[in-house]
Amino acid sequence: MRFFALFIYRPVATILIAAAITLCGILGFRLLPVAPLPQVDFPVIMVSASLPGASPETMASSVATPLERSLGRIAGVNEMTSSSSLGSTRIILEFNFDRDINGAARDVQAAINAAQSLLPGGMPSRPTYRKANPSDAPIMILTLTSESWSQGKLYDFASTQLAQTIAQIDGVGDVDVGGSSLPAVRVGLNPQALFNQGVSLDEVREAIDSANVRRPQGAIEDSVHRWQIQTNDELKTAAEYQPLIIHYNNGAAVRLGDVASVTDSVQDVRNAGMTNAKPAILLMIRKLPEANIIQTVDGIRAKLPELRAMIPAAIDLQIAQDRSPTIRASLQEVEETLAISVALVILVVFLFLRSGRATLIPAVAVPVSLIGTFAAMYLCGFSLNNLSLMALTIATGFVVDDAIVVLENIARHLEAGMKPLQAALQGTREVGFTVISMSLSLVAVFLPLLLMGGLPGRLLREFAVTLSVAIGISLVVSLTLTPMMCGWMLKSSKPRTQPRKRGVGRLLVALQQGYGTSLKWVLNHTRLVGVVFLGTVALNIWLYIAIPKTFFPEQDTGVLMGGIQADQSISFQAMRGKLQDFMKIIRDDPAVNNVTGFTGGSRVNSGMMFITLKPRGERKETAQQIIDRLRVKLAKEPGARLFLMAVQDIRVGGRQANASYQYTLLSDSLPALREWEPKIRKALSALPQLADVNSDQQDNGAEMNLIYDRDTMSRLGIDVQAANSLLNNTFGQRQISTIYQPMNQYKVVMEVDPRYTQDISALEKMFVINRDGKAIPLSYFAQWRPANAPLSVNHQGLSAASTIAFNLPTGTSLSQATEAINRTMTQLGVPSTVRGSFSGTAQVFQQTMNSQLILIVAAIATVYIVLEILYESYVHPLTILSTLPSAGVGALLALELFNAPFSLIALIGIMLLIGIVKKNAIMMVDFALEAQRSGGLTPEQAIFQACLLRFRPIMMTTLAALFGALPLVLSGGDGSELRQPLGITIVGGLVMSQLLTLYTTPVVYLFFDRLRLRFSRKNSKPVVEI
């Protein structure tokens, strides 16, 4: 009583406290960063190593395995995967959430150093690492095009100057430059000319390496001067290499230009990048795992004027893709939804109270509670994102509930003729405990979410804390500012004044009277209501089992990403043609705004494409509908497939895949994996629940096996090292020397000119110089035959691995897909040597599915414990919790009606309903207990009176919560995929709960009261006088 009076009778102090909360909130709002979702990126580090010309199997055994053994000892590694392809190995380390990325990077460098002695010689550089996830979609793609500059020169400028500058921007984790490679001097040898001159490839390589030397020469010094010695020991251009003498034949000099074509070219000619049908260099920018995407993009955009200033006029720099516009649009939609929710909630209050002054009170209390929450969000290190703003949108209905309960009770006393300050004090005292009970029990719902681990726990933590803080501030405001404003702004009125019977008031009276009549009938037919109540419990269980489930709603971010997978024996020239064909098909689609892509490198038969769609307001279709339309057109392209998927704000796992979900096969026996993977992939491809099924296991690449006759080689004076060196020099694009320039280092690349290696007959023209200096053709000591070989070798941990990726057809949920895969694996009878498990997002979904029921039960148990403490009773909390089954039925039926799967967002809605619908029961039970204690009423009379007295605030709070969530259901535009499931769940649960709990709660109250009396009689013992 004294606590409430302190604020009621000190209006200036109360107003200043509210103003301070508001000002802190405004400051916090201005300082909060912006993001699509809470920070949930796993710390990921990518280790890269190269050995040009080495086969995938060689890279896996000699490079990947030693590194994996060393890296696998690092603490906190959640998952380690590797992929080895032609001349390249990439290892992805995913760490636990609690692992600091910088500390992990230091451990990674130490592990690389420890494995260095086990790595093969001939590697052009030490393994390197980057703090970025290569499977993440780039946050921005820049393109460089030019009519006059070569692709190699553009690539050099991009990688040497632009990429270095961009990498220094806060938040940037990796700048991957694609579309070509660094400039190089390429030496294309003529095997026939070499044979005629008696020059071996090794002799050419040694001559070039010896002629291009960068060594310190020292200085000459006398008593007065010092001269630095400088020589022309370096060759920098093709023109300088051409006259190089590499051999003498009968006293005549053989120059490099006599036996080779020497050109200024690039290190790897098998690379191509394009943007909208034009050759281009791509700068694909990815953020650090812990970085904010909006701040990072803003930093890049702020740097663009400086970048454009340093670019020559012949180069055109454009932004081909930017993830931030759709994120900003989505957040703007949520902010508008929040404003609409506040307006609707205040409208509900006005319609019920029919007073401008009375409506002004919650109109002040709601913004103070919501704005004050921003300060706490800033202190907690949160961001303005879809989930935190959705929490505030839902909180609109919650925070007004507390003000409504206090305001309505004070208004009831004023209508009875009590003076304003006295009514404020008396009304607040009566419902103070009720408001505290509602708020604390609502916050208790979110305690299990705060304790939840893994990605779902990290994802929902901001939502739970934001909502809890808003409720906490609302509780304080409702018990301080609201009664003060009621006491000083509202006026007393005569009992049963006429306005109560006008408009909405008349309707409310009629509803209340009808409710009273129906409630009497219900209380006389409690068994029927009991059957209905038990039926809702059973229906909950059945609906939860039957409803399709997924991890997170499929988002339309306006960006598509596609992986190209072509025939495994395709040439680079043919692959480049496939890239152009696919780009033309996509570019012709009316919903596409921009398309970029690249192919080449270590995986000749693959490529990547990035597609920017037009804004949502300029297209009718969703991203998934566009993918479905394009899939039909793209399937007509022979010899290659393009797998499209919508880029999501949440992507789990470090392994790159051509689809959204992955199922990984592991085995310690590589032959067993290679035997069963095609069978499993074929079976999964036939499932109607899966689309775009593909695998990263590619074992049918064309290979030419050379079999050495070691006896013949020994007789001819040739060793295996010389033969292998011949092949590497001929076909391996061997980097034989380094050209040092002020801004970068470039390579001299040697191979037999591709004109002479167009078919297998090129092997017949190869020869080795033996120990006696004679040229011995390769065919003298080797035979060759075609075979199949893997284009890549993949590991997970230290086991051989193959990942089958898949998308979901329209109308199929992830739960249906995972059940179909598990069923198929059982039917196939896969041996124990091959183990299958979901990975990435599908793995997190499986883990979430296993914990969903536990989380719901934990939330209910937590609420029960809190209510038990507040009411000092085991029975009354059960009465309050009896409202939950009807809400669950309504939520699940609404999801089925709107064809929405049960996702993590819908789970949030269920948790919220646990907190919302019990408020009705709390108001009924509180007043019934008070009536029994102070009024001497029977339980039947008490609960009947409580239901009628609390009918108006129950209707107000329920409608306020319903109208607060309704804009989420009706919202469209960017990000609506996240908002709608939450709104559908809450609205459906509230409607069903309101229809049933007004009748089931009083029946359950009487049932437990009778049960309590019967139990107390059985346990009572007669008193015996002594």
UniProtKB/Swiss-Prot annotation:
Record carries keyword Transmembrane: yes
**This protein's superkingdom?**
Bacteria
Q: Which cysteines are joined by disulfide bonds?
A: none
Q: Which UniProt keywords apply?
A: Cell inner membrane, Cell membrane, Membrane, Transmembrane, Transmembrane helix, Transport
**Any one GO MF annotation of this record:** xenobiotic transmembrane transporter activity
Cellular component terms (Gene Ontology): plasma membrane
Q: Which InterPro entries match?
A: AcrB_DN_DC_subdom (IPR027463), Acrflvin-R (IPR001036), Multidrug-R_MdtC (IPR023931)
Q: Give the location in the cell.
A: Cell inner membrane
Q: Which SUPFAM superfamilies match?
A: Multidrug efflux transporter AcrB pore domain, PN1, PN2, PC1 and PC2 subdomains, Multidrug efflux transporter AcrB TolC docking domain, DN and DC subdomains, Multidrug efflux transporter AcrB transmembrane domain
Where primarily located? membrane
Pfam families linked: ACR_tran
Membrane topology summary:
Multi-pass membrane protein
Q: Which residues cross the membrane?
A: 15-35, 333-353, 360-380, 387-407, 431-451, 463-483, 528-548, 853-873, 897-917, 953-973, 984-1004
What family is reported? Belongs to the resistance-nodulation-cell division (RND) (TC 2.A.6) family. MdtC subfamily.
Q: How does it assemble?
A: Part of a tripartite efflux system composed of MdtA, MdtB and MdtC. MdtC forms a heteromultimer with MdtB.
Q: What is this protein identified as?
A: Multidrug resistance protein MdtC
Taxonomy, top ranks, is: Bacteria, Pseudomonadati, Pseudomonadota, Gammaproteobacteria, Enterobacterales
